Amino acid sequence: LVQTSIEFVIGSAGCTDPNAGNYVPNAAIDDGSCIDNAQLDFDTEVTNTGSNHTVYIPADVIFPEGVDFNLEEDFLGAFYLSNGYPILGSDMVFDESINDGSFQVVIFGDDTSTPDPDGFYNGQEFIWAFQDSNSGNSLFLSPTYQNPTSSNSYLDDGIFAVESFDILYGLTGCMNSD
């Protein structure tokens, strides 16, 4: 009797749907973890209104499983709702003198001297999102802040620090198309 045992690795598991928000291009096995693409516009020109709220993202921030954040290529941003649509209201800012992988997200407040909203109102909730640079797909995130008294809302001259992000599986809001 002769027995032979062969072991081989097919590849990593992950979301194999290229239209999903958490698509993993090198995944060989679909693990059923696909999340709808939020289809957010990270190319929007963000206006520096002179009012801001800074959110520090440390190098050791924890992203959800399946989100492989690449600091030099991917995008992380805070959106606000304007007429029911999410609008990018932040910029990722890097300090050239600090190379530990940390960065800041500067979130801009509304310029009240203009008629249209062009930033966050005081107390307006942040809608966090991640965009993968390779696929262009995006998904919503929910932050946990280092200070438990920090809210997830805009505060003029506010400073928060994020400890981790989780995937936000749905964004609720007005469903009336009129």
Report the location of each language-model feature:
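Primarily marks secretory-pathway-exposed extracellular/lumenal segments that are disulfide-
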Residues: 1-178
